[in-house]
From Swiss-Prot:
NCBIfam families in UniProt: leuD, PRK01641.1
Signal peptide annotation: none
Record-linked InterPro entries: 3-IsopropMal_deHydase_ssu, Aconitase/3IPM_dehydase_swvl, AconitaseA/IPMdHydase_ssu_swvl, IPMI_Swivel, LeuD
Name of the top EC class for this enzyme: lyase
GO MF: 3-isopropylmalate dehydratase activity
Matches recorded under SUPFAM superfamilies: LeuD/IlvD-like
Biological process according to GO: L-leucine biosynthetic process
Cited function: Catalyzes the isomerization between 2-isopropylmalate and 3-isopropylmalate, via the formation of 2-isopropylmaleate.
Any GO CC annotation of this UniProt entry: 3-isopropylmalate dehydratase complex
Protein name listed in UniProt: 3-isopropylmalate dehydratase small subunit
Organism lineage string: Bacteria, Pseudomonadati, Pseudomonadota, Gammaproteobacteria, Vibrionales
Length: 200
């Protein structure tokens, strides 16, 4: 997997709190276990006026022309609450989101996002308010998320955020659970070689 060090991207402001995983990816689309193909269903019930997903909702922020191609999602508190479905971060990643900024995230969603190489950045409510004001007032507004320096930069300002060292290491080096395991492939092979034949 590709590591995440710094990313500068267009920002889409989703001005809503307590956005749950059923809103992020509705249950009718949870019919496969591949990570790919969920982006087209992201926020389906908000993005579209019909069940088939053919009539975009012109009122929904992600359908506005100025936010097309956004790779950073700005949201309010408790983003990703609700069920623990990993399809929610799959849909965001498949859509093209690389980082999310909010005052808080649901715990399981937070971990699942990191496992899918997206950076969930927690800033204070005041800092998030400042970013909303900047993004909503500035067409083409971009934000830089610097995981190496643990900084967010926007509109000439710099904001600090925290992430635990282990998760930061995994993101910087593009490691998921399988990748972490494969780092010890030689030790695993040596252990298996020592297993008595009658136990194999």
């Amino acid at each position: 997997m590709q590591g995440f060090k710094q990313h500068t991207g267009l920002v889409v402001p989703l001005d809503a709190a307590n956005v749950d995983t059923d809103a992020i990816i509705p249950k009718q689309f949870l019919q496969k276990v591949s990570r790919l193909g969920f982006g087209k269903h992201l926020f389906h019930d908000w993005r579209f006026l019909d069940d088939a997903g053919e009539q975009p909702n012109p009122e929904f922020v992600m359908n506005h022309a100025r936010y097309q191609g956004a790779s950073i999602l700005l949201a309010r508190e408790n983003f990703g609450c609700g069920s623990s479905r990993e399809h929610a971060p799959w849909a965001l990643a498949d859509y093209g989101i690389r980082a999310m900024i909010a005052p808080s995230f649901a715990d399981i969603f937070y971990g699942n996002s990191i496992n899918n190489q997206m950076v969930p950045v927690r800033l204070t409510e005041q800092e998030v308010d400042e970013l909303f004001q900047y993004v909503q007032a500035t067409e083409g507004a971009q934000i830089e998320v610097d995981l190496e320096a643990l900084k967010v930069r926007a509109n000439g300002k710099e904001y600090s955020f925290e992430i635990d060292d282990f998760r930061r290491h995994c993101l910087l080096n593009g490691l998921d659970h399988i990748g972490l395991t494969l780092q010890h492939e030689d030790k695993i092979a040596a252990f298996e070689a020592d297993i008595p034949a009658f136990l194999r």
